[in-house]
C-alpha cells in the first residue's frame, strides 16, 4: 500500500507545487489598462506584442479597451479608467492648453504615417488630388488626425477644403464605409480593413494613400498622465520595451507571418486579407524603427493643427513628450 501511495502523493504534491508556482507567476504580473483609439491592423506592432507574449515577458498583465476615438481615450485617461492611452498626440496638446495640471505626456510613438486611404468609385491609376475639386467626400471628425491630415494634403496641393469640394463630416467614425455604399459621395477616407473590404466587395477602389502624400507624421503615440509616469516609471519602461519588441517583429517579418501572428485579434477578418493590409502599411513605411518621438515630428504635428485652425497656442515639446523610456528601449 505504501509503495502505491508514495508515487501518488508525489504526483499530487508536484502538481500542487506547479499550480502554486503558476499562480505566483501570474500574480507577479502588474495589471495595466490600455485604452486604444481604434482596433485596427494599422497598429499591428501592438497586437504582435500582445500575441507573442512580450507584455508578459516584461511583467505586465495588459487589459486592452477600444475607446473608439481620441476624445474618448483621453477622457478615460484623465478619469483614471485607463493607465495608458493610445491615440493621436493632438489630444495631449489640447488637454495641456486647456490648463490641466496633470496633463498627458507622450512617451512612445508607434506610427509615422497616416493610416487612412482615399477610396473612389472607380479605379484612377493616374490619380491627382485636384480630381477632388467639385466632388463630395466622406471625411472625419473636425479636430481629429484623419480629417486634419486630409485637409493638410489638400492645402499642400492648392485645394481649399472649405470651398473647392464638399466634405461630409456628419457620419461617425467606422461607419463611413457602409454609408459610402449607399449614398452619393464620390470618395471616402477610410482606415483598414474598410478600404480593402470596399475593394474586395467591388464597392470602391483605393486611389491614394494619405500616409504617403502627407509625409512622415507622428500619427499615433502612447501617453500617460504626468503623475502616473512619475509614480510608475518602471511600468512605463516595461510597457515601452514590449512595444519596441513588437516593432522589431513587424520590421523583420513578412506580411504573411505578421498576419498569422495577429489574426487572433481580428477573428472577423481572414488571414489573407490581413496580410494584404499589412503589406499595404509596410509598403508606405508606416511603422517606426523605434518609439522615440522626435521634436521635429512634434513640431510638424503642431503645424498641421495650426493649419486646420485647431491650435492657437503651441504646447511645449519638453513638457508633452518624454523620450527617456523610448531611447532606453531602442538601445536594448
Label each region the model flagged.
Residues 1-4:
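Positively charged n-region of N-terminal signal peptides that target proteins for export
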Residues 17-20:
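C-terminal motif of bacterial Sec signal peptides marking the signal peptidase cleavage site
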Residues 27-162, 166-170, 186-192, 203, ...:
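Short, glycine-/small- and polar/acidic-enriched structural segments
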Residues 43, 74, 78, 89-92, ...:
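Extracytoplasmic/secreted envelope proteins and their assembly/folding machinery
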Residues 57, 130, 212-214, 284-293:
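Short, solvent-exposed loop/beta-turn-alpha elements that line the ligand-binding surface or hinge
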Residues 91, 173-266:
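Pocket-lining segment of extracytoplasmic ligand-binding domains
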Residues 230-312:
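Secondary-structure end/capping motifs
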Residues 301-332:
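Conserved C-terminal helix/tail region of periplasmic/extracytoplasmic solute-binding proteins
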Amino acid at each position: 500500500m505504501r509503495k502505491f501511495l508514495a508515487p501518488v502523493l508525489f504526483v499530487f504534491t508536484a502538481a500542487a507545487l506547479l499550480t502554486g508556482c503558476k499562480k505566483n507567476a501570474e500574480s507577479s504580473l502588474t495589471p495595466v489598462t490600455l485604452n486604444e483609439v481604434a482596433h485596427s491592423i494599422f497598429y499591428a506592432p501592438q497586437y504582435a506584442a500582445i500575441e507573442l507574449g512580450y507584455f508578459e515577458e516584461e511583467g505586465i498583465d495588459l487589459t486592452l479597451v477600444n475607446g473608439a476615438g481620441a476624445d474618448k481615450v483621453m477622457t478615460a485617461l484623465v478619469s483614471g479608467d485607463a493607465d495608458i492611452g493610445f491615440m493621436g498626440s493632438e489630444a495631449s496638446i489640447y488637454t495641456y492648453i486647456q490648463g490641466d495640471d496633470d496633463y498627458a505626456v507622450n512617451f512612445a510613438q508607434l506610427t509615422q504615417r497616416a493610416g487612412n486611404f482615399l477610396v473612389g468609385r472607380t479605379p484612377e491609376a493616374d490619380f491627382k488630388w485636384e480630381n477632388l475639386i467639385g466632388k463630395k467626400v466622406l471625411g472625419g471628425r473636425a479636430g481629429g488626425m484623419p480629417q486634419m491630415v486630409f485637409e493638410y494634403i489638400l492645402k499642400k496641393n492648392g485645394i481649399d477644403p472649405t470651398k473647392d469640394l464638399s466634405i461630409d463630416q456628419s457620419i461617425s467614425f467606422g461607419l463611413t464605409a457602409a454609408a459610402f455604399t449607399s449614398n452619393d459621395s464620390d470618395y471616402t477616407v477610410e482606415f483598414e480593413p474598410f478600404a480593402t473590404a470596399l475593394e474586395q466587395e467591388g464597392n470602391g477602389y483605393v486611389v491614394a494613400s494619405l500616409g504617403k502624400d502627407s509625409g512622415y507624421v507622428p500619427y499615433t503615440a502612447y501617453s500617460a498622465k504626468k503623475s502616473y509616469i512619475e509614480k510608475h516609471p518602471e511600468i512605463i519602461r516595461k510597457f515601452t520595451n514590449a512595444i519596441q519588441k513588437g516593432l522589431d517583429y513587424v520590421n523583420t517579418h513578412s506580411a504573411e507571418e505578421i498576419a498569422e501572428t495577429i489574426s487572433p485579434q481580428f477573428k472577423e477578418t481572414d488571414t489573407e486579407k490581413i496580410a494584404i493590409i499589412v503589406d499595404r502599411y509596410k509598403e508606405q513605411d508606416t511603422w517606426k524603427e523605434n518609439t522615440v518621438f522626435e521634436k521635429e515630428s512634434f513640431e510638424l504635428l503642431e503645424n498641421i493643427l495650426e493649419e486646420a485652425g485647431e491650435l492657437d497656442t503651441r504646447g511645449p515639446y519638453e513638457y508633452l513628450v518624454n523620450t527617456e523610456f523610448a531611447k532606453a528601449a531602442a538601445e536594448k
